[in-house]
Amino acid sequence: HAADGDSGDDDEALLAGLARLVALAAGTSYYKVAAPTTIAVMIGPITAAEAMFVRELYDHGMREFAARNDLPVPLDQRWELEIDASRAPERVTPGERPTSASDRLAAAGALVPVGGGKDSALVLSVLGDRAVAFTINATEAPRRVAAAAGLTLHTAARRLDPALRDWNERGALNGHIPVTAVVTAISALAARAHGCTDVVLGNERSASEPTRWVGGQAVNHQWAKSLIAEDLTQGALDAVSGGRLRTFSILRPFTEVAIASGLVTDEAQLGAFLSCNEAFTIWRPTAQRAEGTWCLNCPQCRFTTLMMAPHLSPERFEEIFGGRPLHD
């Protein structure tokens, strides 16, 4: 629906711009198959802010992938794209963002991407009924976290081209992509559909710190969660929406330890959240993904149990995690 005060043309341009951001971000899944030197944007002209966003995303967001595949850091990339500043809709003043009459009830809240881990669980705990819970390719963990918050879980489906799996099985390059950027872009499109003007994330302070250095170059496994990435994403959103959409993390000032101490105050979420790598596999089915259980052996499980242990009795700890990995 066109928002009150928006022309149909403006709304169409906004939706087209948001879809463009999804395509630019999601392209990282396919770029990594061969990491080509030339990257061509063939979906028409893009704004300067989108160009800055996508260049940085495919550089810093793919450095972990490059390092683990023994590729140059930074990757050698030459861009073929056309910039058209006239694509941006007229900017509106924040606080005066109009919404569709039929979506006003949903617009009372902020759209929160829910992965099911401790960060999104805490965001829902903080926002309460002001949150609109949203997930992509729903599994047991986000369903459980949304239910613990007393919220309906809105969903979207993302399907990777099956050819990508074929290439992987034949030995194509594979590895980490900036998933948070893909999730944020899809969430922005979903926010517009639900009448929300904010996409609220749960990215913490340490996400802005490099996780390793390669040849003097910073590599950050969590770059897509960093403050720099957030600012670049907001710049691109401003360019395509005229200020109608905002994204930010309410956990940005806090450390992992502080987030753990905050989560223990919500008993419902303590029994619902799941921060386990085995629950988020793509091609490989796991019990953790299907049933929402902890494997207790992946780096994420080890880190999370270590963060939570000081705040829980041994009995409560074992109830939540189904074991005692710190003693095994």
Can you name each region flagged by the protein language model?
Residues 1-109, 126-161, 195:
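RNA-binding accessory domains that recognize and position tRNA/RNA substrates
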Residues 29-42, 191-199, 308-319:
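Short helix-capping/linker segments at secondary-structure and domain boundaries
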Residues 85, 98, 300, 308-328:
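Long, compositionally biased intrinsically disordered regions
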Residues 120-123:
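Short glycine/serine/threonine-rich phosphate/pyrophosphate-binding segments
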Residues 137-275, 279-291:
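ATP-dependent adenylate-handling ligase core
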Residues 277-279, 291-306:
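Local cysteine-cluster metal-coordination motifs and their immediate loop/turn environment
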